[in-house]
């Protein structure tokens, strides 16, 4: 999980999800693309 000040989609399969006030990027096909903002 990468923690960044600005999260962007790396690949088209990425999904941007908001959980508990934080923005996450999740990708089932490429778990290494996981990101969290903050």
Curated annotation (Swiss-Prot):
Gene Ontology process terms (BP)? translation
Q: Name one Pfam family in it.
A: Ribosomal_L36
The organism named in the record is Prochlorococcus marinus (strain MIT 9312)
Domain of life, source organism: Bacteria
The entry's protein name is: Large ribosomal subunit protein bL36
Family in the record: Belongs to the bacterial ribosomal protein bL36 family.
Listed InterPro entries: Ribosomal_bL36, Ribosomal_bL36_sp, Ribosomal_L36_bact
Keyword set, alphabetical order: Ribonucleoprotein, Ribosomal protein
User: Which HAMAP family does UniProt cross-reference here?
Assistant: Ribosomal_bL36
Please name the PANTHER family in this protein's record: 50S RIBOSOMAL PROTEIN L36 2, LARGE RIBOSOMAL SUBUNIT PROTEIN BL36B
Picking any one GO molecular function of the record gives: structural constituent of ribosome
Alphabetical GO CC annotations of the entry are: ribonucleoprotein complex; ribosome
């Amino acid at each position: 999980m990468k923690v960044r000040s600005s999260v962007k989609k790396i690949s088209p399969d990425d999904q941007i999800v908001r959980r508990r006030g934080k923005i996450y990027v999740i990708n089932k096909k490429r778990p290494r693309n996981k990101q969290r903002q903050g």
